[in-house]
Amino acid sequence: MTDNIFDDLPLHMPREVVQTLIQSADVRIERIVSHGHASAADFWYDQPQHEWVIVLQGAAKLQFEDGMVEMKVGDFINIPAFRKHRVDWTTPDEATVWLGVRYNAVLEEAG
């Protein structure tokens, strides 16, 4: 049986919605839906897992201590564990749908 990542997107959300699609001890795959959401001005993610994210719909800006990264559909980034970051902006007029993969293992990047 298959599911579709774009099914049942929440319409009105007071905050970003994170849904775990599948997980194991070392990997968690999530659907993240934002609709004009951003991290609080004084909040930084500083997590013990690595995180790979791709924007599937919408757009976003991620802020790091050393600069800003703009992301559009198809853009992906690998964020190493403990690299401080925050969501600075997501598209206000449509849902931004991300696929996020959090992992503990050391992986080699292709290419």
List each model region and its residues.
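A short, N-terminal "cap"/entry segment at the start of jelly-roll beta-barrel domains
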Residues: M1-D42
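Structural motif
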Residues: A59-K61, M68, K84
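Ligand-binding loop in jelly-roll beta-barrel domains
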Residues: F82-E108
